[in-house]
Amino acid sequence: MTGTISVDSFVAHALFDSGASYSFVSEDFVSRAGLSVQRLGHPILVSSTNGSISSCSVCQGCSVILADEVFSANLVVISLGAFDIILGMD
């Protein structure tokens, strides 16, 4: 399922993925929204149909507004294609 959400007051095109263990944010969206990035203590290996990549960066405590409800999300920074955000089960 896809949709439009707000992340730290910026509009984001999101994919809702119940099979994802983490939530992700695109490097491009991080730059556009000026999100604060922290280094992870260890890299996270992300597997997809296109192969595997690792990430050492996270945007912690992002405000995500979905259906008028505000949630806090930790978003792992990766290169994404068509989406700004992938919201997983975390």
Regions found by a protein language model. Give the residues of each.
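Aspartic protease
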Residues: 1-90
